[in-house]
């Protein structure tokens, strides 16, 4: 019994000591510890304005659709839901929801193939919003090359990949390149043919010739035609050409040309004949001058002595010397009186002026022949009388 009492007392004492210690520990609450916090690092998140966010959302929608298609989601109803997103965060949430629901029914095999990318987390935060690092998971394929899921660093790389992806032109015929908010470039294939840019028109060589109006051009052609026509007609004088070149209107050129041609044609068709003067030239013999050629000097007395010896000698001397021309004898007054009665002197002068030169010569020859015959006949009669 004594042992039991001692154990009991020890247990009670231990309990008192433990309880007091516990109560003492619980009563003394520890004070608040002050810890110096380090300054927060500046956020690497891109801060965009409202307009920039709208442009980024507009560019990311076709990229999101293309990625869903690559997963095998081709329903237009589901793809059209992408267009209803009003913010980049809403677009990201919608894509993740569609992806998770689709992957539950269509799990992706983990076996790697040539066409299967190394990473299957195609819709990480940095892909759509550009909030992550430049080189995140899925940026490069297993060969270390960039792919269209995560963009290309340069536009040239994106264009090369797009040309290679076109492959069969019967399906995809064109592509477009766009730059995401993350600064990387993406291509989107299209079945419509791209419009070929129009080539800039080549500049034609400038015409160095002096510019002229239509009236000046017509005047120039009219002058050239007029000069050519004058040359064709045989007119080569520079005087006429200069006159045409000085003309200031087409009408003036035509008028000058017609006047010159008319004057030139008049000279050829109606050549001027030499004027015939009524005055009698020297050594010219008229018909009446030979009426008394056998009578010597042509007086009345010489006419009466026509059958005398002196008259015969004079006639024979004249016949023996035919080369010497005799002076014309004066006309008989009686014959002049008779002719004055018939023809007036003015009329006689007009007839002489109108008579051509060839006709005069014929008349002179006939009168000479008649005079010689009359002289021979007179000589013959005088010889008979003597006998």
Swiss-Prot record:
Biased composition (Polar residues): 270-282
Positions carrying Pentaglycyl murein peptidoglycan amidated alanine: 358
Residue ranges with Basic and acidic residues bias: 298-360
Region (Disordered): 122-155, 266-360
Annotated GO CC locations: extracellular region
Prosequence residues removed at maturation: 359-387
UniProt key word Secreted: yes
Membrane topology type: Peptidoglycan-anchor
UniProt keyword terms in alphabetical order: Cell wall, Peptidoglycan-anchor, Secreted, Signal
Region described as GA module: 213-265
Compartments, as annotated in UniProt: Secreted, Cell wall
The organism's place on the tree of life at top rank: Bacteria
Motif (LPXTG sorting signal): 355-359
Signal peptide: 1-26
Xref: Gene3D superfamilies: Albumin-binding domain
Role summary: Binds serum albumin.
Listed name of the protein: Peptostreptococcal albumin-binding protein
Lineage: Bacteria, Bacillati, Bacillota, Tissierellia, Tissierellales
